């Protein structure tokens, strides 16, 4: 269906009580990398690690937020996110948002203190944007999602689409991505929520 290749960045999961050496992280993932809790939201406990000395403190920090920690390779590219919902008679994939963070990554400050620029629709070539929309819809179906979801990607050199994260309970504050995308689509969030609720009954 024109999805093209989809990439997933190199990652490791650690559970509490499991130890990993600095050398293992460097050999398997490389530096810089992200070390973050594998649960929760708002980028609490996330560290961008650039040096060997920072690996273990970052793991400890992440374990304060979750019993599982994820170590992910760093990717340089354009961060985007795309929301979607489906009912029995319609499919809605929202305009894509591009995230330009003033910080090292899209952390709590960038999310909630206005330290980022969010551009909807994203500045992507149309064929790349269409691939992202098709991919978002396909993932929704593959996972059997219901209600609203939001999927985060990074577009790297050569217009490679890299899947980052699937959010099945996306934020719904006024400044969150989904309400922004709903507005950009010329829709009203109340109508969207009514649509989803009525589809349940």
Q: What role is predicted for each listed range?
A:
Residues 177, 183-201:
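Generic C-terminus detector
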Residues 50-134, 155, 160-162:
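Phosphate-binding site of ATP-dependent enzymes
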Residues 73, 83, 140-172, 182:
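Conserved metal-phosphate-binding beta-hairpin within the catalytic cores
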Residues 1-7:
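Short, small-residue-biased leader/transition segments that mark boundaries at the very start
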Residues 26-44, 67-76:
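ATP-grasp fold ATP-binding core
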């Amino acid at each position: 269906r024109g999805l093209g290749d989809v990439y997933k960045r190199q990652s490791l999961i650690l559970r509490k009580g499991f130890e990993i050496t600095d050398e293992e992280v460097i050999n398997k993932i490389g530096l810089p990398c992200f070390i973050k809790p594998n649960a929760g939201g708002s980028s609490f406990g996330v560290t961008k690690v650039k040096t060997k000395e920072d690996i273990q403190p970052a793991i400890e920090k992440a374990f304060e937020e979750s019993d599982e920690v994820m170590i992910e390779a760093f990717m340089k590219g354009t961060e985007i996110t795309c929301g979607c919902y489906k009912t029995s008679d319609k499919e809605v994939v929202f305009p894509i948002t591009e995230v330009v963070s003033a910080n090292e990554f899209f952390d709590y400050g960038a999310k909630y203190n206005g330290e980022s620029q969010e551009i909807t629709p994203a500045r992507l070539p149309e064929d790349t944007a269409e691939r992202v929309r098709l991919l978002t819809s396909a993932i929704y179906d593959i996972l059997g999602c219901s209600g609203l979801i939001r999927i985060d990607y990074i577009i790297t050199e050569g217009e490679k689409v890299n899947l980052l994260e699937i959010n099945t309970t996306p934020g719904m504050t006024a400044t969150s991505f989904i309400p922004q995308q709903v507005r950009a689509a010329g829709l009203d969030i109340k109508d969207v929520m009514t649509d989803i609720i009525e589809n349940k009954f």
